[in-house]
Amino acid sequence: MNAVTEGRKVLLEIADLKVHFEIKDGKQWFWQPPKTLKAVDGVTLRLYEGETLGVVGESGCGKSTFARAIIGLVKATDGHVAWLGKELLGMKPDEWRAVRSDIQMIFQDPLASLNPRMTIGEIIAEPLRTYHPKMSRQEVRERVKAMMLKVGLLPNLINRYPHEFSGGQCQRIGIARALILEPKLIICDEPVSALDVSIQAQVVNLLQQLQREMGLSLIFIAHDLAVVKHISDRVLVMYLGHAVELGTYDEVYHNPLHPYTRALMSAVPIPDPDLEKNKTIQLLEGELPSPINPPSGCVFRTRCPIAGPECAKTRPVLEGSFRHSVSCLKVDPL
């Protein structure tokens, strides 16, 4: 346990989560079995009340699919996802309805996630009208205005349309829509990657402020390692659908154990120009393997500088302590 999670209850428990897609191309005969794309392949973790979990990894590693599988937007192939002790996988649509008021999502492209034919007042109010149909129009409007103020939008903009706002403002609208039901968990799927750097900082600071005020837990997915370090309590590193390292942000950033994590962290820019000039970047050789035909054993072994013969035979699993665990046969997690 760390200071953030000590004494707090487990909100989300994920065990051996897998998301596989069947792929059949035009070169296959109809009687041939389809190929399998392993987008997420056996991720296990716990998320605690009030915690922010950062998820990092290169494009195509399964970050977004992992997040969408949690909330049921993508169907999981196998594994377990429990919310407050209740199994989510296999739930019926009417059962999901109650859970989704507790778990909301903020999407990557702020403008594309908003209906262009609806005013922002209607967009933010839509979850309220869905879950509280008996709420009066006046009460809905007042709650929408209060939420707009909370995310930094002026209430007099309530009747405007999404195209009249900047990217940062559209993301604030998306945040307001996600928070209007007062959920316990927000899944942020690369919420700042489409924004300018200055706007990114504003959105991240807003999320942290709202987390303190509302007692939220966050799953924050991003490419920008500096942003993830700034906002996260713990960090999950993914590679080709696998969890390769998990730990507190301090351990993962300052004492990375997995060769892939070391390469990632070596690419983070250092503000001091003298240190930046003299640092060594660990370059990975070879191409990223296909998730349709991943390597046997450790999926990172084809690009790993310390891989041995045993890495082709045995698939490693996360081992270590709560503060720091790693999935590597060549590294001692303790």
From Swiss-Prot:
<dbReference type="GO" id="GO:0005524">
    <property type="term" value="F:ATP binding"/>
</dbReference>
<dbReference type="GO" id="GO:0015834">
    <property type="term" value="P:peptidoglycan-associated peptide transport"/>
</dbReference>
<dbReference type="GO" id="GO:0140205">
    <property type="term" value="P:oligopeptide import across plasma membrane"/>
</dbReference>
<keyword id="KW-0997">Cell inner membrane</keyword>
<dbReference type="InterPro" id="IPR017871">
    <property type="entry name" value="ABC_transporter-like_CS"/>
</dbReference>
<dbReference type="GO" id="GO:0015640">
    <property type="term" value="F:peptidoglycan peptide transmembrane transporter activity"/>
</dbReference>
<dbReference type="GO" id="GO:0016020">
    <property type="term" value="C:membrane"/>
</dbReference>
<feature type="domain" description="ABC transporter">
    <location>
        <begin position="12"/>
        <end position="265"/>
    </location>
</feature>
<feature type="binding site">
    <location>
        <begin position="57"/>
        <end position="64"/>
    </location>
    <ligand>
        <name>ATP</name>
    </ligand>
</feature>
<keyword id="KW-1278">Translocase</keyword>
<keyword id="KW-0472">Membrane</keyword>
<keyword id="KW-1003">Cell membrane</keyword>
<dbReference type="GO" id="GO:0016887">
    <property type="term" value="F:ATP hydrolysis activity"/>
</dbReference>
<dbReference type="GO" id="GO:0055052">
    <property type="term" value="C:ATP-binding cassette (ABC) transporter complex, substrate-binding subunit-containing"/>
</dbReference>
<dbReference type="InterPro" id="IPR003593">
    <property type="entry name" value="AAA+_ATPase"/>
</dbReference>
<dbReference type="Pfam" id="PF00005">
    <property type="entry name" value="ABC_tran"/>
</dbReference>
<dbReference type="Pfam" id="PF08352">
    <property type="entry name" value="oligo_HPY"/>
</dbReference>
<dbReference type="GO" id="GO:0140207">
    <property type="term" value="P:tripeptide import across plasma membrane"/>
</dbReference>
<dbReference type="GO" id="GO:0015031">
    <property type="term" value="P:protein transport"/>
</dbReference>
<dbReference type="GO" id="GO:0005886">
    <property type="term" value="C:plasma membrane"/>
</dbReference>
<dbReference type="InterPro" id="IPR013563">
    <property type="entry name" value="Oligopep_ABC_C"/>
</dbReference>
<comment type="subunit">
    <text>The complex is composed of two ATP-binding proteins (OppD and OppF), two transmembrane proteins (OppB and OppC) and a solute-binding protein (OppA or MppA).</text>
</comment>
<protein>
    <recommendedName>
        <fullName>Oligopeptide transport ATP-binding protein OppF</fullName>
        <ecNumber>7.4.2.6</ecNumber>
    </recommendedName>
</protein>
<dbReference type="InterPro" id="IPR050319">
    <property type="entry name" value="ABC_transp_ATP-bind"/>
</dbReference>
<dbReference type="InterPro" id="IPR027417">
    <property type="entry name" value="P-loop_NTPase"/>
</dbReference>
<comment type="similarity">
    <text>Belongs to the ABC transporter superfamily.</text>
</comment>
<keyword id="KW-0813">Transport</keyword>
<keyword id="KW-0571">Peptide transport</keyword>
<comment type="function">
    <text>Part of the ABC transporter complex OppABCDF involved in the uptake of oligopeptides and of the ABC transporter complex MppA-OppBCDF involved in the uptake of the cell wall murein tripeptide L-alanyl-gamma-D-glutamyl-meso-diaminopimelate. Probably responsible for energy coupling to the transport system. Plays an important nutritional role and is involved in the recycling of cell wall peptides.</text>
</comment>
<keyword id="KW-0067">ATP-binding</keyword>
<dbReference type="InterPro" id="IPR003439">
    <property type="entry name" value="ABC_transporter-like_ATP-bd"/>
</dbReference>
<keyword id="KW-0547">Nucleotide-binding</keyword>
<keyword id="KW-0653">Protein transport</keyword>
